[in-house]
Amino acid sequence: GCNLVVSHHPLIFKGLRRIAGSTVTERAAMAAIRSGIAVYSAHTSLDSTMGGVSYAMASRLGAEVERVLVPSELQFKRISVTCPRELAASVRLVLLDHDAGTEPCSDNSSLSPTAPVADTDSAVSYYDCEEESLPKSPGPEPGVVDIRHTALTRVEAVVPAWKCAGLAASVTEIPGAESAKIDILPLDNQPANLGLGVLASFPQPVSMAELADKIKKEFGCRAIRVSAAYAPDAKVRRIALCGGAGGEFIGKARSAGAQAYISADIRYHDFADNRSGMAIFDIGHFESESCAKDIFYHVLTNKFANFAVYYSEIESNPVKYL
């Protein structure tokens, strides 16, 4: 009876030119379409968000995240809407509907649905008018008319840069907000907790042998590949982790001072070129991302109490070990 499947790895990883049933992917897409089932896959987004796959990997091993290994280049901006006080609640709701103010570098204090509206300084708006459009009631001196004292409110939020245009358009669609002043401002303090991989540390050092055993247990690994720097009795406290194929970040992990790097799909030459004392653990692509279902289940059951959410027990690792 389900009508939505949520997955980490996308059903359609490469673009389809047709859906004719000639490949496994095409047949799966056809089955979903015929059954009216939507498929939502959070792949790179779940890899790079705070609390995503790499965070969950560290949590499984009992390590505390210190920071992101490779910070995201996604740019954020601050959108500021100055409008009459009576429109502030409507503006706030529009921003909330677009998930504004939930970004890591925002305290979202101005977007709490029940937060009191905070006025800017009591503003005096001067409207310059052409001579022929002057109101009948003159102002205090020639050429200056219609001096209005209006209580204004400024509503602000931090949003990804790509959302700004759509947000601004939505605000102007609010009845009465056509003339609202909308400023989109750059940020110097870009979020540092979004990106790929994490650097984490254990409360107490563990041996590499203990770490290997824990990896096998927590991620269900039949086997793991390790680099020449692996020494069973060597102690490890700081580790770097990256779910999925993380070979390109070996240098980042080494520069960050990690004593062990846990990822997947490490190439032969990456193992051969690693001349440092940092040990590399290749635990398998599927295994490294096995915590994704836990993340989805936790988010959905906590946010949507009235949804029937089923945790699939089907494991579909395409790699088999002999």
Where are these regions (language model features)?
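Hydrophobic structural segments
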Residues: 1-322
